[in-house]
Regions:
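The canonical Cys-X-X-Cys-His
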Residues: 38-41, 83
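Structural micro-motif
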Residues: 69, 75-86
Length: 136
């Protein structure tokens, strides 16, 4: 389930069986943990789908916490909806609550630009930690 450039992807409904493969084979994955009984989740669903159409290179994944309770537990989901962004297999963002379309779009753009190997000043993390150890 690797995203292909130029190919519009529908929102993927993930389960315990396919979630790890999706998260492990894509650079960035945006996840919406939700439940059918959750009013805010149902209101956020169309926003999630709408924004997903703007990013053909990023999979947007929905996980129903009642259908995949072990996955929700492993992800430490305490409230729904919860939006999570995974980059290179690491969770780089998690927030309970729905987002506005512009905020979700900004979040995806920030995730695409985020480089976990750089610090806030743009220096390589390995370089900055090496220079700190030089004085010892």
């Amino acid at each position: 389930m690797i995203a292909l450039k130029g190919v519009k992807m529908a929102v993927i409904h993930a389960t315990q069986d396919n979630f790890e493969k999706i998260a492990g084979t894509n650079e960035i994955v945006v996840v919406d943990f939700w439940a059918t009984w959750c009013g805010p989740c149902r209101a956020f669903g169309p926003i999630f789908e709408q924004v997903s159409e703007k990013f053909d290179d990023v999979p947007f994944v929905k996980v129903d916490i009642d259908q995949s309770p072990d996955l929700a537990s492993a992800a430490e989901i305490k409230a729904v909806p919860t939006v999570m962004v995974i980059k290179r297999g690491d969770v780089i963002y998690r927030q309970a609550g729905a987002l506005l379309p512009a905020d979700l779009e900004d979040l995806v753009n920030q995730a695409k630009a985020y480089d976990p190997s750089k610090d806030d000043e743009g220096n390589s993390v390995s370089e900055s930690s090496e220079s700190e150890n030089d004085g010892e």
